Amino acid sequence: MAEIWFLVVPILILCLLLVRVIVSKKKKNSRGKLPPGSMGWPYLGETLQLYSQNPNVFFTSKQKRYGEIFKTRILGYPCVMLASPEAARFVLVTHAHMFKPTYPRSKEKLIGPSALFFHQGDYHSHIRKLVQSSFYPETIRKLIPDIEHIALSSLQSWANMPIVSTYQEMKKFAFDVGILAIFGHLESSYKEILKHNYNIVDKGYNSFPMSLPGTSYHKALMARKQLKTIVSEIICERREKRALQTDFLGHLLNFKNEKGRVLTQEQIADNIIGVLFAAQDTTASCLTWILKYLHDDQKLLEAVKAEQKAIYEENSREKKPLTWRQTRNMPLTHKVIVESLRMASIISFTFREAVVDVEYKGYLIPKGWKVMPLFRNIHHNPKYFSNPEVFDPSRFEVNPKPNTFMPFGSGVHACPGNELAKLQILIFLHHLVSNFRWEVKGGEKGIQYSPFPIPQNGLPATFRRHSL
């Protein structure tokens, strides 16, 4: 009997191993194949190719070679790039539960781990609703007089400068509007110290993440601690006053979940800093591009001036403030904004990470791989926008095809503050074309990334008063 078992056991083990190999092979085959593309050098992948040229050229050349879904390796991470509206919707909307937002740890430290865009699930849903309720039309329409004041103050200061770095000054404007929307009327001392420390964090955000004393990143980490301290002081003051506020901070302080739990000071601080980051650079970049596009097309600029002049005269040459109705009745100016968003594609792509193995159109997206919907490739695809390299606001007289225009992202992680962004841009442009002329200086053309695309050197220009 022992001799029989001596022969049977090895045969059984061999059979089990064969079954396991066959099942594993079938499972592997059923998982689909990886998308076409090149993974480049070990670890580095194609990082050098991406950063040594215009990233839009890199992605466009890849799409021409491999199609609308392709693989690569960037900064050590295997990635799948998606350049079709259907694929973007798949990742961001219909199958969003299979993908999670992903950011480098170094950037998460500077913004704060509790910030809205690092999360999914109930916490993300709660915070997103708070952001949306803070920036509903019913809320932001009350900010119009204050945004007007900020816009006019900014423009008047520019008229006294020999040369204006348009992008840098637009960042200051967007920051001041962000502070207004978050805190309401904040004491100037708090505003200045917030601005000082925020600027240090902003400079270190895209620096090499080396936390050694003296480096930009280390300075940014120290300034981030200061920001948390300042925001905590403001929170304590607000709680002592027990005043019901409808600004973003007020919504955060008044929040309770279904279990009666409130947000911690750290969660509040992280989300305030996160909203500031989201509000500043993208709005500033968009405004800078609009000024360039209008400057380069004087006929279009005159048409925008004519539209704004009607409102200017209706308000007795600015003796009356803008109204919400008037900001909703600027059709040409609005089309200029959305065409600028398409043309510049300030949010060129977004990052997600597959949380499970995902199959899309016969291709495998393995668990743990980064996934990047390429918004700019979609916005500049002639299948969806004719003559995509031509700036033409009239194209938006007809609504674009579904999922082909995503300037603020899409799905549950789309920008919840886009209405505030559009409102402040409309207000700024009204006062700009009604009261000023500007002239772009320097002959440099092209795009630089900081990290968002902006005109070369931030569009240096002069601004002079000139009423309609």
Curated annotation (Swiss-Prot):
Report the catalytic activity.
2-cis-(+)-abscisate + reduced [NADPH--hemoprotein reductase] + O2 = (+)-8'-hydroxyabscisate + oxidized [NADPH--hemoprotein reductase] + H2O + H(+)
The answer to whether the entry has keyword Heme is yes
User: So, what pathway does this thing act in?
Assistant: Plant hormone degradation; abscisic acid degradation
According to its UniProt entry, the protein's GO biological process terms are: abscisic acid catabolic process
What does the entry say induces or represses the expression of this protein? By abscisic acid, dehydration and rehydration.
Q: Which domain of life is it from?
A: Eukaryota
| Pfam families assigned | p450
- Where's it mainly located? membrane
The entry lists its GO molecular-function terms as: (+)-abscisic acid 8'-hydroxylase activity; heme binding; iron ion binding
Which key words are in the record? Heme, Iron, Membrane, Metal-binding, Monooxygenase, Oxidoreductase, Stress response, Transmembrane, Transmembrane helix
List the EC numbers from the record. 1.14.14.137
Can you say where in the cell this protein is located?
A: Membrane
The text of the family note is: Belongs to the cytochrome P450 family.
Q: What is this protein called?
A: Abscisic acid 8'-hydroxylase 4
Give the organism the record lists.
Answer: Arabidopsis thaliana (Mouse-ear cress)
UniProt lists the gene as CYP707A4
